[in-house]
Amino acid sequence: IYSDIDSKDPSKLLEYRDLDDGALSNILLRGRSTTGQWYDFRGENFGREDMYMNLRGGQYDAWKGRLYWDWIPHERGINMRTPLLDAPSADLRNRFPQPNPDTWAQFNYGYQRKDLGGFFEWQRNSPWYFRVDANQVNTDGLKVGAAANGTSPGNGYIDLPIPVDYKTTNGTFEA
């Protein structure tokens, strides 16, 4: 067995999954009734950074709907070091020289993406219908940026931890 995972930075192993100690979970529930109603619930990794839940349901030839939660971590680097002061923050300052990397600021590159959404569709009078969709995506953490150390190409570049905290809300209606 071969692995290129370095024990000093296991971020590739954890890039999109929460592998910390804890209980793993995976649930699938399905229900059907004689009146045509149905539901499906699927969930995994409850309470973890990579939690997923999906609830669908409806009534045949009448309506259907869905609610979902999808959390995805994206680890880019663990215990990274930078000579910049106050990292990670929106105010990055430097104090050079700092020859000893053990005194540099430590941080984790990565962000958490949380998507919550759903839809409802009424189709009782087929082919006529209406549908409402909505979701909200929250992203929080650090993304990688870069900057030149000067105006000459010989000065090199430095990676910057750029704080990210934004929310996107989407909605649609069709009939």
Protein language model annotation of sequence segments:
Residues 11-16, 38-40, 101-106, 117, ...:
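Extracellular loop and loop/strand-boundary signature of outer-membrane beta-barrel proteins
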Residues 1-3, 41-45, 57, 67-71, ...:
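Transmembrane beta-barrel strands of outer-membrane/channel proteins
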Residues 20-25, 47-51, 110-116, 167-171:
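Residues that define the transmembrane beta-barrel architecture of outer-membrane proteins
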Residues 4-9, 47-51, 61-63, 73-79, ...:
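Gram-negative outer-membrane beta-barrel proteins
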Residues 1-35:
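Outer-membrane beta-barrel initiation region
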